[in-house]
Design a protein with these regions (language model features):
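Loop/turn-to-beta-strand initiation segments
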Residues: 1-2, 69, 122-125
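Short secondary-structure boundary/capping segments
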Residues: 14-23, 87, 142, 188-190
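C-terminal helicase lobe and adjacent C-terminal extensions/tails of nucleic-acid helicase motors
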Residues: 58-67, 73, 78, 82-109, ...
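Conserved ATPase-coupling elements of RecA-like P-loop NTPase cores
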Residues: 136-140
Length: 279
């Protein structure tokens, strides 16, 4: 069962830059939602505005500050800090990024949810990295999103008017000035695939999402960088264990670090006393 707000193209042949990048897709996919496009129109609750002309940090911060309850999502922790520092101190302003430990993130997200429901707190502005685009249930009437692929843009829009409290929420896509952009690798490929779509596209339409992923896939050199298919289709053996070790849905080269947050050091001391070690 595949379910997401930004469903990739999963069926049909899409040709890449070489035969290794050809995507043959999955056959016989069945849509479980009747009248998909009609339902899509009924659930439309966000207006999306895109401005790809480069702006400075000061210009973006000034635009964000025009709104009292607003979320701004950027691509890097540096961009998050630059914009956060430029926001006025006329209300509550908060920051979310992986510079915070999970417990701190969880606490701050809970605080944001409480503040958004507090009518006595009219100004709540949040600057965040992409971590809020997946699995974070927050709802702002206005969302800003730094330039990115269409799938990321729509995930950001999913934090806007999420509960349908207003007739229409508004999501703005902006671009930083050239010297600040610094998009590399897959992020640059995703953004360029979006830029190649017609400017008058219906950005929420399933057909537009399909066109976007066709653009993105066509730029690929290969879909199997570690040649995992080789281990699954050897004539004499099926090397499932080797393939499993090589496959990573999301590359993760991180190392867990225990930091002093709330009562963590007390817990660490208890572990040490019990003879446990952490490495």
């Amino acid at each position: 069962l595949f379910t997401t707000a930004s469903q990739p193209v999963l069926s049909g042949l899409i040709e890449g830059t070489n035969p290794k990048a050809d995507f043959k897709g999955i056959e016989h996919i069945k849509e479980i939602i009747p009248e998909e496009f009609a339902l899509h129109d009924q659930l439309r609750r966000v207006k999306l505005s895109i401005d790809d002309t480069g702006k400075t940090y000061d210009e973006i911060a000034a635009k964000v500050s025009e709104y009292n309850k607003v979320l701004c999502i950027v691509n890097t922790r540096k961009d998050a800090k630059e914009l956060y520092d430029r926001l006025p101190n006329d209300g509550v302003k908060l920051h979310l990024s992986r510079m915070m430990c999970p417990a701190h993130l969880h606490e701050t997200i809970g605080k944001i949810k409480t503040l958004l429901k507090d009518e006595s707190q009219p100004i709540v502005r949040v600057i965040a990295t992409q971590l809020v685009e997946a699995g974070v249930d927050i709802d702002f009437p206005v969302v800003f999103r730094q330039e990115a692929g269409l799938d990321s843009v729509l995930q950001a829009a999913g934090r806007c008017n999420r509960e349908g409290r207003s007739a229409m929420g508004h999501t703005f896509v902006f671009s930083l000035a050239a010297e600040k952009r610094k998009l590399f690798g897959s992020m640059a490929d995703s953004n360029n695939a979006r830029l190649n779509l017609p400017e008058d596209s219906d950005w929420f339409a399933p057909s537009t999402m399909k066109a976007y992923f066709c653009q993105l896939y066509s730029r690929k050199q290969t879909f199997d960088e570690k040649d995992i298919k080789h281990w699954l289709y050897k004539p004499t053996e099926l090397c499932f264990e080797t393939a499993s070790k090589e496959f990573r849905l999301i590359d993760d080269t991180s190392i867990n670090v225990i930091v002093n947050w709330e009562n963590s050091m007390e817990l660490i001391e208890q572990l040490k006393e019990s003879g446990c070690t952490y490495s």
